[in-house]
């Protein structure tokens, strides 16, 4: 029996196998001593090397590697770069630290080849010891060993992980000089390095100069453009891609979804299906995210169908289940979100966080907090930063100051989660909504991190609710420095001045907006009719085919609401115009147009769901609440802050928003 046919290692260290290998090696040595030809000796040595390589492939721990290394030393193969390279790569594969064992392996080798050096460089890089990896490359060059393409691949990966752009450029230059650039996988690694170093223009230059590309070259750059929000360049590359695989389609679908272009995401998903590519879990999750942004029930139903058709039942796939919970919540159907949550066999922190956030945005604070308490006391799942955002948002949307403080204090004290700017935003929002503006300002001053625009924006929004121009100016000053081009901040300050009757302040802000060349985001509300068609409404929109009927319905509705005591809240109009002009402006707000259209086109018992891109004003909130009473309709209204469920004259927010 030859060495090549010796028994392979079992899953544990097996002395019998080692003993058998020793006997075979001894027999081989005797045979070689009796052999008369160099050819026979060479063949026997090749069999020995082949057997050792095979045994290294089967190693599952360091002890087994050391036993093989012992045989290598005893048989005089300690100078074999081929075997030692394999040994080093096996150490790396098993996660064994390079120091001290790997270094001891290579130090006695007199003539180290580039593959052995590369194995060591790669091992240090994978271990995260990038300085050592670079130092090993320096030693290699001192020995005048010419690097191979694999060497540059390992070094470029290390530069990408370190995000060291300057070092990456140096290796790029050396790669080009030594013609390692000719290999596709080296070019791909270079693209990846530049992408990780946030130098996408350099990545594109590498791509354009590559003599040969594969699908990875294309998809790496497409995904990079998508991550930075440049969907135009991503689409241009995608359309040029000769063969579009699942990775490329996924990059486009998820890219559009993540960059707030849900309609395009759905279009690319449809194209993918028509091309015969089967969606994977990530693509389906991207599709569901796009549906959530559109906020229409017809998309929600199709998302469920696609998930099930693709073999990703929410009950068994936690990623899909969590995405569906988020989607149903954002489409206004929190009950269905709860049903999905209850049906899931496995839940993780993202599942609980999605459900807590869903309940919070729909004004069901006690249910959200109960679920949070259940998760932290009855399961082994630990809350993360998103979970705490959901719990704090529940408190904020319902004015639960004491409970909010308890949740906030428990973050670090109980769970070791350091509060972030987003958590401070929730606390400032909670204190501000309840009129504790000075306390909210003091909290900001004591923050352990620099506040971002969200923190100051929450305070400015609270000043709008409670008509406090003094603190509003403090918040606005910080906002204008942090977010100088966000027009919403200027409009919010203008509204504070308008509510206080300070029209001079309003004019100053408007002048500032004009000087900066900022453009106001136009308000738009939309609903989906019974046929699945989306209808969009803009302020004073007269282009809709039913505009005359909509205006008549609004006038009729105003008359009915007036009987209940409705009077337009003129403070919601931040313009120094007559009261009559303010009334005309208010009646043309987009959500009111959408409501009138829905009353004309829906069945008596059906729920009306309206989506809006901006925050609903105080007058529209009062209007919707009273409309739900006189029409007997359930009206679900989602603005850019939260959901409002209007039923029988009441709102789920308890008029606290």
From Swiss-Prot:
Among its keywords, does the record have Repeat? yes
Question: Which keywords does this chain's UniProt record carry?
Answer: Repeat
For this entry, the protein name equals Pentatricopeptide repeat-containing protein At5g44230
One biological process term from GO is: RNA modification
Q: Where is this region: Type E(+) motif?
A: 532-562
Q: Which GO terms describe its molecular function?
A: RNA binding; zinc ion binding
Q: Which NCBIfam families match?
A: PPR
Q: Which domain of life is it from?
A: Eukaryota
UniProt repeat feature PPR, residue ranges? 45-79, 80-112, 113-147, 148-178, 183-213, 214-244, 245-279, 280-314, 317-347, 348-383, 384-419, 420-450
Is the keyword NADP assigned to this protein? no
**Family label:** Belongs to the PPR family. PCMP-H subfamily.
Q: Which residue ranges does the record annotate as region Type DYW motif?
A: 563-657
Name of encoding gene: PCMP-H17
Region: Type E motif, residue numbers: 455-530
The record's InterPro entries line, in alphabetical order, gives: DYW_dom, E_motif, Pentatricopeptide_rpt, PPR_At4g14850-like_plant, TPR-like_helical_dom_sf
């Amino acid at each position: 029996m030859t060495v090549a046919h010796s028994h392979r290692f079992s899953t544990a260290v097996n002395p019998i196998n080692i003993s058998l290998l020793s006997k075979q090696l001894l027999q081989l040595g005797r045979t070689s001593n009796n052999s008369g030809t160099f050819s026979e000796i060479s063949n026997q040595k090749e069999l020995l090397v082949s057997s050792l390589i095979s045994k290294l492939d089967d190693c599952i721990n360091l002890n087994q590697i050391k036993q093989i290394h012992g045989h290598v030393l005893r048989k005089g193969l300690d100078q074999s770069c081929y075997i030692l390279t394999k040994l080093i790569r096996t150490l790396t594969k098993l996660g064994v630290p390079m120091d001290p064992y790997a270094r001891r392996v290579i130090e006695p080798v007199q003539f180290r080849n580039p593959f052995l050096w590369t194995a060591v460089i790669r091992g240090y890089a994978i271990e995260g010891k990038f300085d050592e990896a670079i130092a090993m490359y320096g030693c290699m060059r001192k020995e005048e060993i010419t690097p191979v393409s694999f060497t540059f691949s390992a070094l470029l990966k290390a530069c990408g992980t370190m995000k060291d752009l300057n070092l990456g450029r140096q290796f790029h230059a050396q790669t080009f000089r030594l013609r390692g650039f000719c290999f596709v996988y080296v070019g791909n690694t270079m693209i990846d390095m530049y992408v990780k170093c946030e130098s996408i223009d350099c990545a594109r230059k590498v791509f354009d100069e590559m003599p040969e590309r594969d699908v990875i070259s294309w998809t790496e750059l497409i995904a990079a453009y998508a991550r930075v929000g440049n969907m135009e360049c991503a689409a241009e590359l995608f359309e040029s891609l000769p063969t579009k695989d699942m990775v490329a389609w996924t990059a486009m679908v998820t890219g559009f979804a993540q960059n707030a272009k849900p309609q395009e995401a759905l279009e690319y998903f449809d194209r993918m299906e028509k091309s015969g590519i089967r969606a994977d879990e990530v693509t389906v999750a991207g599709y569901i995210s796009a549906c959530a942004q559109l906020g229409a029930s017809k998309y929600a139903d199709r998302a469920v169908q696609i998930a099930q058709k693709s073999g990703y039942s929410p009950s068994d796939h936690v990623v899909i289940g969590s995405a569906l919970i988020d989607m149903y919540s954002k489409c206004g159907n929190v009950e269905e979100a709860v049903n999905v949550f209850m049906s899931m066999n496995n839940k993780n922190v993202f599942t609980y966080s999605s459900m807590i956030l869903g309940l919070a945005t729909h004004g069901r604070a006690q249910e959200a907090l109960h679920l949070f308490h259940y998760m932290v006391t009855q399961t082994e799942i630990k809350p993360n930063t998103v979970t705490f955002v959901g719990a704090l948002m529940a408190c904020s949307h319902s004015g639960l100051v004491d409970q909010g403080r308890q949740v906030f204090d428990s973050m670090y004290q109980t769970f070791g989660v350091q509060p972030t700017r987003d958590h401070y935003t929730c606390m400032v929002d909670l204190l501000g909504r309840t009129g504790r503006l000075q306390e909210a300002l003091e909290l900001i001053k004591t923050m352990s991190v620099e506040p971002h625009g969200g923190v100051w924006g929450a305070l400015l929004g609270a000043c709008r609710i409670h008509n406090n121009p003094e603190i509003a100016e403090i918040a606005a000053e910080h906002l204008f420095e942090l977010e100088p081009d966000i027009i919403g901040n200027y409009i919010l300050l203008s509204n504070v001045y308008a509510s206080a009757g300070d029209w001079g302040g309003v004019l100053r802000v408007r002048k500032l907006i004009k000087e900066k060349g900022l453009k106001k985001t136009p308000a738009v509300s939309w609903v989906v009719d019974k046929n699945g068609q989306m209808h969009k409404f803009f302020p004073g929109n007269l282009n809709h085919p039913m505009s005359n009927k909509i205006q008549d319905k609004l006038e009729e509705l105003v008359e009915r609401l007036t009987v209940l005591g409705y009077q337009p809240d003129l403070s919601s109009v931040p313009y120094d115009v007559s009261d009559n002009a303010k009334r005309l402006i208010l009646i043309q707000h987009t959500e009111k147009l959408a409501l009138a259209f829905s009353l004309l086109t829906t069945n008596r018992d059906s729920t009306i769901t309206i989506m809006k891109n901006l925050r609903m004003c105080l007058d529209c909130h009062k209007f919707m609440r009273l409309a739900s009473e006189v029409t007997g309709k359930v009206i679900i209204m989602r603005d850019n802050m939260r959901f409002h469920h209007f039923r029988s004259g009441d709102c789920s927010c308890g008029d606290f928003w």
